[in-house]
Design a protein with these regions (language model features):
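Terminal alpha-helical segments
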Residues: 1-141
């Protein structure tokens, strides 16, 4: 039976199989954890916290996908695949998907609607992703 990853691979589909790369995995993890730490910096505006935390989440989720040996052609799929990459449920990936939508509305339509509640939820989701990614053994070089 094909995996959820295999079902999303192929021409016109959002994933492609690609062997994991230890340096890439470690770099994505380091970048994600640094951005997550920076998102909690004192004196940051909500929009800066959101931007840092969203990009931290994306880097960490992408690291998990790369660990499984796949590359994504779009940002959203790394959040949708969290049940398969890190065994995280909808309470996490739905927050990240909402943040992706908020980010896109801001980037492409100039309508950035960030609330303190959204940033708190995003940081909590990032913490769960970070804990799971940090528990992964880096792929062999």
């Amino acid at each position: 039976m094909p995996s959820a990853f295999d079902n999303l691979c192929g021409p016109g589909k959002p994933l492609q199989a690609e062997p994991p790369n230890a340096k890439e995995f470690e770099g994505l993890c380091a970048m994600g954890l640094d951005k997550l730490s920076d998102a909690r910096g004192p004196g940051l505006k909500l929009v800066s916290q959101f931007d840092l935390a969203y990009n931290a989440a994306h880097a960490l989720c992408l690291a998990a996908l790369r660990w499984h040996g796949y590359r994504s052609s779009n940002r959203y799929i790394v959040f949708q695949l969290l049940p398969h990459t890190l065994q995280l449920g909808p309470e996490v990936w739905r927050i990240l998907a909402k943040c992706h939508d908020v980010r896109n509305r801001g980037e492409y339509e100039g309508m950035l609607e960030i609330t303190e509640r959204l940033v708190i939820d995003l940081l909590g989701a990032c913490d769960k992703v970070a804990a799971k990614v940090s528990a992964l053994t880096p792929p062999s070089p």
